[in-house]
Design a protein with these regions (language model features):
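Well-ordered, non-membrane alpha-helical segments in soluble/globular domains
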Residues: 37-38, 115-131, 166-177, 215-232, ...
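Catalytic-face loop-and-helix region of soluble metabolic enzyme cores
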Residues: 274-367
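N-terminal basic, low-complexity leaders that serve as flexible interaction/assembly modules and, when applicable
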Residues: 13-90
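Structural preference for beta-strand elements that scaffold enzyme active sites
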Residues: 21-28, 52-54, 140-146, 189-193, ...
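Aromatic-lined glycan-binding groove of carbohydrate-active enzymes
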Residues: 226-306
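Acidic (Asp/Glu)-rich catalytic clusters
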Residues: 128-140, 182-187, 231-239, 272-278, ...
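Active-site-proximal, glycine-rich beta->alpha crossover segments in alpha/beta enzymes
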Residues: 92-186, 192-225
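N-terminal amphipathic/basic-hydrophobic helices that include classical n-h-c signal peptides
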Residues: 1-19
Length: 367
């Protein structure tokens, strides 16, 4: 399985100097450091315009800290308990305590409440359509909804045997969120991105956030990671765009693992592409700020074709100049790509967001 979906134009790269290629198109990975969806959507459309094929709402509110709000939601379910007597304060009024299945509780009997993703998407889509009707968002641009893989939430907040027990329960809950979104938003307006971070931690056996990140199923962990993500990709209907954002974490702008090259990113992406029944509309791969070396990008030569490839090589610390160095290093191995940050912009310092967006515009051509 390869190639762009029907009617899609592959990402191109245009010459913008004698010795450098210019990427075409930009992707906003998800979170954007603005207070509300309208500001995010307006600003993104204004600064990036036709470089964007889809615009997210910025993951505002409790989603600002990615999945950290999920324990407060899941913890309301009968049969789920919080670990520890006292709340662990976290920004946005979040309680960061972990979760466990109550003693003697059959996990299959647990009924999780709505997780909050569908409600947020439906609310923000109303803003998006209003702005598009006003002409603030170009016609044809889709509304992007980012969802975490179930593995991220399970591996972050559950422990031991509870992980295997709760996995089918939480997976069903996230698929219900997706189905609500699919029922409420016209498919021709929708793009769904799966945020894939903990999976890379398991592949790399990362310990950057404390303990080693490990799988909880029998057999080769890699095979289980591939099959789980392929199921999620295929849960998105063919008339809805689907993307995958691979990530090495972004807690305080720090990774849980520092990759030497893109080899495991390419290996995982290729396996998921091969295992999925439908094509990926886009694939996003992170590029750490320290890597403007060709060795990091060399594995991209073996990447299976996808509709659009975005390299997360834009960093606030070195702007367009640093992005240009990384573009030059990537070009011999990935002749067609657009640009993005390596993770969401949400955790960037306040006041830096506009500059980051402008960097995208400086280094990427419009469609």
């Amino acid at each position: 399985m390869s190639g762009a979906a029907a009617g899609e134009k592959p990402v191109g790269v245009r010459r913008y100097s004698e010795d450098m290629t210019q990427p075409q198109g930009a992707l906003l990975v998800g979170s954007v450091n603005y207070d509300d969806a309208e500001t995010t959507i307006r600003t993104a459309a204004d600064l990036l315009g036709t470089r964007l094929r889809r615009i997210p709402d910025g993951e505002v509110g409790k989603r600002f800290h990615w999945i950290m709000f999920q324990p407060d939601v899941i913890g309301r379910a009968e049969g789920i308990e919080r670990i520890g007597e006292e709340p662990i304060p976290f920004p946005a009024g979040i309680d960061a305590r972990g979760l466990r299945i109550g003693e003697g509780v059959d996990a299959a009997s647990i009924e999780l409440p709505p997780l909050g993703y569908a409600a947020a998407a439906i609310e923000s889509y109303a803003v998006f359509t209003r702005l598009q009707a006003e002409g603030a968002v170009p016609a044809g641009v889709r509304f992007q909804v980012s969802l975490p893989t179930p593995l991220a939430v399970i591996s972050s907040f559950f422990h031991g045997d509870d992980r295997a027990a709760i996995e089918p329960v939480y997976t069903s809950a996230i698929v219900r969120e997706l189905d609500r979104i699919l029922a409420a938003i016209p498919h021709e307006d929708l793009a769904v991105q799966w945020d894939v971070a903990s999976e890379m931690g398991i592949i790399e056996r990362a310990a950057g956030y404390g303990s080693v990140m490990e799988a909880w199923w029998p057999g080769d962990p890699f095979d289980g990671l591939v099959s789980r993500l392929a199921v999620l990709v295929d849960a998105v209907p063919a008339d809805v765009e689907v993307g995958v954002h691979l990530c090495y974490g972004d807690a305080g702008e720090k990774h849980f693992f520092e990759p030497r090259d893109a080899g495991n990113l390419v290996r995982y992406a290729n396996a998921v592409v091969a295992a999925s029944d439908r094509p990926l509309t886009w694939l996003h791969l992170p590029v750490p700020i320290d890597h403007d070396d060709e060795a990091y990008f060399a594995p991209l030569a073996d990447l299976a074709p996808v509709g659009e490839l975005y390299l997360g090589l834009v960093h606030r610390e070195d702007g367009a100049e640093g992005a240009a160095r990384r573009i030059a290093a990537a070009a011999p191995f990935a002749p067609e790509f657009g640009v993005a940050t390596e993770c969401g912009i949400g955790r960037a310092p306040a006041g830096s967001t506009e500059g980051i967006l402008r960097t995208h515009a400086e280094v990427a051509a419009a469609w």
